[in-house]
């Protein structure tokens, strides 16, 4: 039975996630066959879906088991839809072999250093356990959800029953970890401290690589040097307990780390792509707008602060876009992307 559960977890992470992302990216010409972008799109879709169904489920007093069943079924349906879209596209346009310029010896050395740096960070994040006061709430919340099959109905500090913790239930990232723990059969504390870095750290570097590639003028040869520079900043970024680097390395089980180290950089990446499309191609694919709205949902999943930050970031982007294009039309889909964050923000203000 434990082996079967581990296989289910691997299927979720390595098959279902990129499968969902591939269906979304099928309509984005530049990233149609980019596996890193497929993983990013897949995780954003999964987080957005979880945020969408978890908050109402928690408010209605549903169990973790019930939420997990519904979420699992929806994920499988999304995977089937994504796979069907990809298969239909392959029949329509057969894949051509992409001819790439071979790596030079210098590039290979830089890539080896970059990959070694990521591996070192993964080992440090897993082996050198970091003790943090917030774990008393977040990790315990995941543990209580799995143990008692309830969500935000028990106090994590003394395990006493309580009324619904509405403030924290608007950002149910600990419940997503509880779902993965329940799926794999691994204790929530072990999963939080050991496996979450193995999931979020590689994803974060995929995002940094995708963003760096664009910032460097799509020059592939400079990308490994960019990643090495990012690794140096992250490895020596623990100048306080509140930096994005500290959250990424040592607090990946907390939703704040998801927000600052993964979702916000992903939003910058999507906004950079959208800006390029709207300024030069005059039109952006609908899938990009969909991914941006999913990123807003994902920001709320990580932290209620994400519900405030994401509409603000999109609003600043909209003002810059209006100044550069002198057109109001792109602001309409941008506003619809803000709506999830605005709704959760109003809800938080009302019930706080």
Each model region followed by its residue ranges:
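Specific aromatic-rich, kink-prone transmembrane helix
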Residues: 16-17, 253-279
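Membrane-embedded, hydrophobic transmembrane alpha-helices
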Residues: 1-100, 341-349
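Transmembrane signal-anchor helices characteristic of membrane glycosylation enzymes that use polyprenol
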Residues: 107-133, 338-349
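Active-site lumenal/periplasmic loops and adjacent helix-entry segments of GT-C-fold
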Residues: 117-233, 243-251, 262
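Perimembrane helix-loop-helix junctions
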Residues: 310-336
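Membrane-interface alpha helices of multi-pass inner-membrane proteins
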Residues: 58, 287-306
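Membrane-interfacial loop-to-transmembrane alpha-helix junctions, especially the N-terminal start
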Residues: 30-46, 111, 220-227, 284-291, ...
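Membrane-interface junctions at the ends of membrane-embedded or membrane-associated helices
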Residues: 24-32, 83-93, 271-290, 322-332
């Amino acid at each position: 039975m434990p082996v079967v559960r581990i296989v289910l977890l691997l299927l979720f992470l390595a098959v279902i996630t990129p499968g969902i992302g591939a269906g979304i990216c099928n309509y984005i010409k530049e990233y149609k066959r980019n596996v890193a972008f497929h993983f990013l799109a897949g995780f954003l879709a999964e987080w957005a879906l979880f945020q969408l169904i978890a908050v109402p489920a928690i408010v209605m007093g549903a169990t973790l088991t019930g939420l997990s069943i519904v979420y699992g079924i929806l994920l499988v349906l999304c995977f089937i839809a994504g796979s069907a879209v990809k298969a239909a596209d392959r029949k329509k346009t057969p894949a051509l072999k992409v001819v790439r310029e071979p790596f030079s010896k210098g590039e290979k050395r830089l890539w080896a250093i970059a990959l070694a740096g990521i591996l070192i960070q993964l080992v440090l994040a897993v082996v050198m356990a970091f003790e943090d006061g917030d774990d008393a709430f977040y990790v315990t919340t995941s543990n209580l959800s799995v143990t008692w099959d309830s969500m935000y109905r028990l106090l994590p500090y003394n395990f006493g029953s309580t009324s619904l913790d509405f403030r924290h239930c608007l950002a149910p990232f600990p419940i997503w970890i509880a779902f993965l723990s329940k799926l794999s059969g691994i204790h929530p504390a072990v999963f939080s401290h050991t496996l979450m870095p193995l999931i979020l750290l590689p994803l974060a570097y995929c995002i940094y690589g995708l963003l760096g590639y664009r910032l460097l003028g799509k020059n592939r040869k400079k990308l490994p040097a960019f990643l090495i520079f990012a690794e140096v900043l992250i490895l020596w970024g623990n100048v306080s307990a509140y930096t994005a680097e500290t959250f990424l390395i040592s607090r990946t089980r907390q939703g704040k780390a998801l927000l600052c180290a993964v979702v916000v950089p992903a939003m910058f990446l999507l906004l950079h792509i959208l800006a390029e499309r709207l300024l030069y191609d005059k039109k952006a694919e609908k899938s990009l707008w969909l991914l941006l709205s999913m990123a807003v949902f994902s920001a709320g999943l990580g932290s209620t602060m994400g519900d405030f930050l994401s509409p603000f970031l999109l609003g600043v982007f909209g003002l810059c876009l209006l100044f550069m294009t002198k057109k109001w039309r792109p602001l309409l889909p941008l506003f619809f992307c803000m709506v999830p964050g605005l709704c959760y923000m109003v809800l938080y203000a009302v019930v706080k």
